Amino acid sequence: MPNHSPSNDNAKFAIGQLIHHQLFDYRGVIADVDPVFQGSHSWYEQMARSRPTKDAPWYHVLVHDATHTTYVAEQNLAADPSADPIRHPLIKEVFDGFENGRYIARHRSN
């Protein structure tokens, strides 16, 4: 997952924040943020059925109780008020810990 976080001043959600997908009713944690849609046209046509805007932030999400990640438009997400940790096999690779209802991102070297 690319690290675009320095250019995401307009993003509503931050890396490490717990979210809830409003359409597909799952919990997850933000692993990375793209300031605008970075996927291919074919992926968008096949996967983004609700046709969310491409000109707003999109998020790489580790899905709770799953092994996959998702790529989600900001308009489909809401903050998850549960503050419960996420179970995902990549958690320890992406984050250093969990405090006060959010994950602490690992520092990435270039």
Residue ranges of predicted features:
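Generic preference for well-ordered secondary structure
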Residues: 3, 12-17, 45, 79-82, ...
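Short, solvent-exposed secondary-structure boundary/capping segments
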Residues: 37-46
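Mixed-charge, Lys/Arg-rich low-complexity intrinsically disordered regions
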Residues: 1-18, 23-27, 34-37, 106-110
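Short, glycine/acidic-enriched capping/hinge loops at junctions between secondary-structure elements
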Residues: 31-32, 41
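Intrinsically disordered, low-complexity, charged/polar segments
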Residues: 54-110
